[in-house]
Regions:
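Conserved, mostly hydrophobic/aromatic
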Residues: 3, 11, 26, 39, ...
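Glycine-rich beta-alpha junction loops
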Residues: 108, 130-134, 156-167, 226
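N-terminal binding-site loop/beta-alpha segment at the start of enzyme catalytic domains
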Residues: 1-37
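Short, hinge-like loop/turn segments at secondary-structure boundaries
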Residues: 29-31, 56-58, 118-122, 142-146, ...
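Glycine-rich, positively charged active-site loop/lid region within alpha/beta enzyme cores that binds
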Residues: 146-211
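Glycine/proline-rich, positively charged
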Residues: 5, 45-140, 150-151
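Conserved short secondary-structure transition element at the edge of the structured enzyme core
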Residues: 5, 94, 118, 157-158, ...
């Protein structure tokens, strides 16, 4: 609720966060201002068959204490379920008024190809990891989304706080946050088995910090401003 009081109007959650607890918290916190906010949540990847998807949507509606979901997203692709069937079910949910729009999350070009072939199935948005230090989407999926007018919603925009400027070295980062490929696989919470790029990552962070200082702006603001100017970012 404090975020709303500071001007935030889009709230994104998922049933996977705390087994529905996050949805229930969002629903309770925003109940009195529901008509002034946009609520987005996600369909679990294991529940993308039409019947299961509709049941998952109903659970989210109940958790969120709302009559409709503004943006209902597929959390991750699932190659075992025919994506056309999933999108047909999403269209039905939209027609029934249970969702206002549907989107996807973590979808690549191959995942989205069937949607382009059927205009009714084109998602409103694709939620992707994107920030100054993680720009993999720029190779293929970002241009694809721009071409097909699919908005990009960014998660990890400050890379677990690294782009806030509060950490001066890899050792300053809490272990549970030091788990991306930027960090050595020797860090306890990593799972990638790669050497990482800690020196390079923090050298880049130092340069961003210097640029922010020259602009007399917080490093987080500079990082987010850069992101907002990227093609396709909503």
């Amino acid at each position: 609720r404090a975020a709303y009081e500071e001007g935030v109007t889009l709230f994104d959650t998922a049933p996977a966060y705390g087994d529905g607890a996050a949805e229930r918290l969002v629903g309770e916190a925003l109940a009195s201002v529901r008509d002034r906010v946009v609520i987005a949540t996600k369909a679990p990847s294991e529940e993308l068959a039409p019947k299961a998807l509709k049941a998952a949507c109903d659970r989210s509606l109940e958790n969120l204490k709302t009559e409709h979901i503004d943006l209902y997203q597929i959390h991750w692709p699932n190659s075992k379920i025919k994506i056309e069937d999933t999108f047909a079910a999403l269209v039905e949910l939209r027609s029934a008024g249970k969702i206002r729009a549907f989107g996807v999350s973590n979808f690549g070009v191959k995942d989205l190809a069937p949607c382009v072939a059927q205009p009714d199935y084109l998602p409103a948005a694709n939620q992707l990891a994107y920030n100054l230090l993680f720009r993999a989407i720029e190779y293929e999926i970002q241009p694809f989304c721009v071409k097909h007018n699919i908005a990009i919603l960014c998660y990890s925009p400050l890379l677990h706080g690294l782009l806030s400027g509060k950490f001066l070295s890899a050792d300053d980062v809490p272990p549970e946050r030091a788990r991306t490929r930027h960090f050595s696989s020797k860090r306890p919470h990593t799972r990638h088995g790669e050497p990482g790029a800690e020196a390079e990552t923090f050298a880049a962070i130092d340069e961003i910090r210097k640029a922010a200082r020259e602009l007399d702006e917080p490093m987080a603001s500079v990082s987010l401003s850069w992101l907002l100017m990227r093609p396709g970012v909503a």
